[in-house]
């Protein structure tokens, strides 16, 4: 499973839209979409915020 697939799975599991997640991370919805489709990757700060938000470790 890619990082993007994990983000998408965790996001949908929490019932969040891409816009909801983007607002929580203070990024654009397009950024979230690009992460989920593998067109880009979040920076370390955002990865840490994602881990905290979803209650997972960064591994």
Where does each model-flagged region fall?
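Short beta-to-alpha loop/turn elements within the nucleotide-binding domains of ABC transporters
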Residues: 1, 16, 56
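A short, Lys/Arg-rich alpha-helix, primarily the initiator
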Residues: 1-13
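Residues within the helices of the helix-turn-helix
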Residues: 8, 19, 48
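Alpha-helical residues within the helix-turn-helix
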Residues: 12, 23, 52
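Short alpha-helical DNA-recognition segment
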Residues: 15-34
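DNA major-groove recognition helix of helix-turn-helix/homeodomain DNA-binding modules
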Residues: 45-59
